[in-house]
């Protein structure tokens, strides 16, 4: 993970009735952002991983605005990566609350066998055996940071759905690429965009290898999906973007252009290498 200086202007104000704070992780990416939409239904977006410091921070931040865990009325998971959702099952259980997540994230959210199937796919890519050993070790370690999610609490979200959360209607945008069912939330009335990890000010999001559960292909075309999803953000022009990592920012079109150029340039480099070496 390469963290760099922000590529766009930052903003130091948040939309009304919104709490934002960082939750620690043991990963190189550093802390993850958690957002609480304070109007009813009180909604926590990305409650972090099942990690002692994370839980303590989450409880303390809620307490700072006079809320307890049981005051939470809804949980949103932007995508099923451990740093964002590991605590979601615990929080929903404690609060007796539903969990909203993109429909294509459910295989990862509810069944960790998906990760082992992905490992078997990655083995076919010709990666050296010594490097392959990293994957099962990581997948095994990840389990300690994930609370089992009760499937009956999960509400699958599709693109274009309107979700009434935090006292306002939010438009669901399924923006695949970094994750198959990555969920971004757009609020046109306040010109606010919760972008998850789809667009970040100080990290270039990486389209990840994902199993394809919806077609005969072994894997999803993550880079193509990511670039297509980026194009949707260009037309929004929000006043403030609340990302999964890093500070809130503006100038979405500028960041979209920079991010797109980065990925296309890297793709050109890889193509040139394949043509030069004859690698399959």
Predicted regions and their residues:
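Short beta-strand or tight-loop elements
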Residues: 17-19, 58, 153, 159-161, ...
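Short Pro/Gly-enriched beta-strand edge/turn motifs at strand-loop
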Residues: 14-22, 141-146, 166-168
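Conserved beta-strand hairpin/beta-sheet module of binuclear metal-dependent hydrolase folds
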Residues: 9-65, 71, 185-201
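Short capping segments at the starts of secondary-structure elements
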Residues: 272-280
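Active-site HxH/HxHxD metal-binding segment of metal-dependent hydrolases
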Residues: 30, 53-55, 63-164, 191, ...
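Metallo-beta-lactamase
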Residues: 43, 49-51, 143-154, 169-267
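Short, structured coil segments at secondary-structure junctions
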Residues: 14, 94-95, 237
């Amino acid at each position: 993970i390469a963290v760099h200086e922000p590529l766009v202007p930052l903003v130091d104000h948040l939309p009304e009735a919104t709490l934002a704070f960082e939750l620690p992780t043991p990963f190189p990416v550093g802390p993850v952002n958690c957002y609480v939409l304070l109007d009813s239904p009180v909604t926590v977006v990305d409650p972090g991983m099942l990690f002692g410091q994370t839980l303590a921070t989450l409880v303390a931040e809620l307490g700072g605005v006079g809320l307890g865990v049981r005051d939470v009325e809804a949980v949103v998971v932007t995508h099923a990566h451990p740093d964002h959702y590991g605590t979601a099952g615990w929080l929903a259980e404690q609060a007796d609350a539903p969990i909203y997540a993109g429909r294509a994230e459910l295989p990862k959210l509810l069944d960790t066998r998906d990760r082992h199937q992905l490992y078997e796919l990655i083995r076919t890519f010709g990666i050296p055996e010594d490097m392959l050993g990293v994957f099962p070790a990581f997948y095994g370690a990840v389990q300690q940071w994930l609370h089992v999610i009760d499937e009956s609490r999960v509400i699958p979200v599709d693109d274009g759905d309107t979700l009434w959360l935090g006292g306002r209607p939010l438009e669901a945008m399924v923006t695949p690429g970094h994750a198959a069912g990555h969920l971004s939330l757009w609020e046109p009335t306040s010109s606010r965009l919760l972008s998850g990890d789809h667009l970040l000010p100080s990290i270039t999001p990486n389209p990840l290898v994902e199993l394809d559960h919806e077609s005969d292909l072994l894997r999803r075309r993550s880079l193509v999906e990511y670039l297509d999803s980026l194009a949707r953000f260009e037309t929004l022009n929000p006043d403030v973007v609340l990302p999964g990592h890093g500070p809130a920012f503006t100038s979405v079109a500028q960041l979209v252009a920079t991010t797109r150029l980065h990925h296309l340039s890297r793709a050109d480099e890889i193509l040139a290498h394949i043509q030069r070496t004859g690698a399959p």
